[in-house]
Amino acid sequence: MTRRRSSVLRRLLQGVIILVAGIAVLGGLSSCARTDLATLQDRTPQLELESFFAGETVAFGIFEDRFGNLRRQFRVALNGTVDGDVLTLEEFFLYDDGEKDQRTWVIRKLGKGEDGLMRYAGNAADVTGTARGGIAGNAMNWQYDVVLSMSGQELEVHFDDWIYRQHEDVAINRAYVSKFGIEIGAVTIVFLRGDAAKALQPLDLENWS
């Protein structure tokens, strides 16, 4: 099956990747180690991915380059359906320049791993291979690669994706984007569901204002 290339990610990351690749050759930069997921086991409120994202969710996000410069803003309407241990999560994006995009995740709950953490695997059209991760306490971390088409060539970037549940109806997402093992940017998203989401409905995905 042919993977759909994300034009949105391509435009976001192309200039940053070229710049950082040059810096890497000259300076040997490396990315920082992240938190050990298992250390968050006692954090609350507990996150269960399939129950949190079942039904309608709205989200607001930004993309920053590795230097902290704001590159893009966006909003998202999400709709999740659960069938047994499978969560199908549809995402519809509107960016601040008027561009639209969408993604559908199919996420499977695998059960507890040897480390005692609940494990998940997921697939989406613009993700190469399978995203894999786990949940501890109020946090989820999963890793995946996205293949972009740039100037007629394919380029793969890596996402180190963290979700932290803050309230029954609120979660914060921080995803670190890297290439050649070097962080090139980060995505921050706030997810709202329940009454918080209803207060913002209908979410305008036609016009940015």
Which role fits each region the language model picked out?
Residues 1-29:
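Sec-dependent bacterial lipoprotein signal peptides
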Residues 26-46:
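Bacterial Sec signal peptide processing site at the extreme N-terminus
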Residues 33-38, 76, 82, 95, ...:
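Sequence-level preference for short, compositionally simple segments enriched
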Residues 51-63:
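Tryptophan-anchored aromatic micro-motifs
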Residues 60, 65-150:
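Central antiparallel beta-sheet cores of small beta-barrel/beta-sandwich binding domains
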Residues 70-76, 154-159, 183-185:
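Amphipathic hydrophobic-ligand
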Residues 130-134, 139-176:
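Surface-exposed interaction patches
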Residues 160-209:
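Glycine-rich, aromatic-bearing surface loops/beta-hairpins
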